[in-house]
Swiss-Prot record:
Involved in the biosynthesis of isopentenyl diphosphate (IPP) and dimethylallyl diphosphate (DMAPP), two major building blocks of isoprenoid compounds. Catalyzes the conversion of 4-diphosphocytidyl-2-C-methyl-D-erythritol 2-phosphate (CDP-ME2P) to 2-C-methyl-D-erythritol 2,4-cyclodiphosphate (ME-CPP) with a corresponding release of cytidine 5-monophosphate (CMP). Its cofactor is a divalent metal cation. Binds 1 divalent metal cation per subunit. The record marks 34, 133 as: Transition state stabilizer. Pathway: Isoprenoid biosynthesis; isopentenyl diphosphate biosynthesis via DXP pathway; isopentenyl diphosphate from 1-deoxy-D-xylulose 5-phosphate: step 4/6. InterPro entries: MECDP_synthase (IPR003526), MECDP_synthase_CS (IPR020555), MECDP_synthase_sf (IPR036571). 4-CDP-2-C-methyl-D-erythritol 2-phosphate binds at residues 8-10, 34-35, 56-58, 61-65, 100-106, 132-135, 139, 142. It comes from the Bacteria. Gene3D superfamilies: 2-C-methyl-D-erythritol 2,4-cyclodiphosphate synthase. This is 2-C-methyl-D-erythritol 2,4-cyclodiphosphate synthase.
Amino acid sequence: MRIGHGYDVHRFAEGDFITLGGVRIAHGFGLLAHSDGDVLLHALSDALLGAAALGDIGKHFPDTDPQFKGADSRVLLRHVLTLIHGKGWKVGNVDATIVAQAPKMAPHIDAMRALIAEDLQVEPDQVNVKATTTEKLGFTGREEGIAVHAVALLLRA
């Protein structure tokens, strides 16, 4: 078995929604990114790639490559799954913590878990997503962006 850790950050930018875990959430800002800015799926992808010793999302989906401009991070996550399956691994479980002062995540967590489970071909109880604030401290507390920490456990297929 293998474990991996992923971390990603995106700053807020002009827009009226963000996408987290594949779920579109109304917000006064968007997230600045080359792809769709789904910081949750980016952190999960990095955790999975790390566990399989396959590098990171920057290696597989560089922000200098125009083909990934505006890319759907769910498609990228499914590609990551193909890569780890190709190395003889399957997902045991994933766990992520969203760090954001706003918007409130609780109403969206179940939908995020369901989409992530679908994309990773696992049961929803193998996916955990939680959210916290930093009590208005730091860049997330000042509502300048969102950060996500994620871990993944891989098992031999």
